[in-house]
Each structure stands twice: as structure tokens, then as C-alpha cells.
């Protein structure tokens, strides 16, 4: 089940890129089937033009309900199923960017050239 850390995130999620929406919902289903866990959206929009969040092409998902091994397994599965299409970037990144470990999910702009 796809859940939101705060109600305003649900409203922001309604604005995300169509492909991103589908990928996040697929992640939610896969996570529920493999690990019997819900998926929680923790961040959508950010007011920083250098961030994919600014363009509604990225969201962050909670990872603390999974072990590190499970997180890496999910990351590998999602990146195989939904390749970003522009190296060295990935669709799903399990990382700590200073605010704690989480999943960053992103899609590239449709006009981006594949590399």
C-alpha cells in the first residue's frame, strides 16, 4: 500500500511525472509482495532548480522498515525493471544524503537524450 508521511505529500504526488507515478506504484506492489511492507512517501517537491524534485520527477521513500540487504535487493530489482536510460544515473538510489538512509526515485526528462 502506498502511504504518505504527511497529507500535503499526497497532493504533491498527484503532480508528479506520469512515469514516476507508475514506477512508485510498482515499487509499492513489489515491496508488499516481497517483504510484506507498505511504501511511505517522505518527500516530493523541493524548491531547488538543481533538484529533480523541483520538476516533480523525483520522490523519496522510507527505507528504515527494511534491512540493508532488503534495501539493496529492492534497489537492484527496480533498476533492472526501470532503467534510467542515462548513465551513470539510476532510477532508484538507496543512499544517505545527510538526512538519513532512504530511497530516492527519479525519472529523466522526456527530452533528455539517452546515453
Show which residues each predicted segment covers:
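Active-site acidic/histidine clusters and adjacent loop/turn architecture
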Residues: 1-35
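Catalytic cores and adjacent binding grooves of peptidoglycan-active enzymes
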Residues: 14, 50, 55-57, 63-115
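Short secondary-structure junctions
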Residues: 31-39, 83-88
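Active-site nucleotide-donor binding segment shared across nucleotidyl transfer reactions
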Residues: 36-52
Amino acid at each position: 500500500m502506498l502511504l504518505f508521511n504527511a497529507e500535503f505529500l499526497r497532493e504533491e504526488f498527484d503532480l508528479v511525472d506520469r512515469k514516476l507515478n507508475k514506477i512508485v506504484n510498482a515499487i509499492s506492489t513489489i515491496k508488499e509482495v516481497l517483504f510484506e511492507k507498505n511504501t511511505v512517501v517522505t518527500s516530493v517537491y523541493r524548491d531547488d532548480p538543481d533538484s529533480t524534485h523541483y520538476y516533480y520527477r523525483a520522490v523519496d521513500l522510507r527505507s528504515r522498515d527494511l534491512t540493508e540487504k532488503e534495501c539493496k535487493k529492492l534497489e537492484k530489482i527496480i533498476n533492472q525493471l526501470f532503467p534510467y536510460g542515462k548513465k551513470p544515473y539510476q532510477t532508484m538510489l538507496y543512499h544517505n544524503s545527510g538526512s538519513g538512509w532512504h530511497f530516492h526515485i527519479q525519472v529523466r526528462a522526456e527530452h533528455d537524450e539517452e546515453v
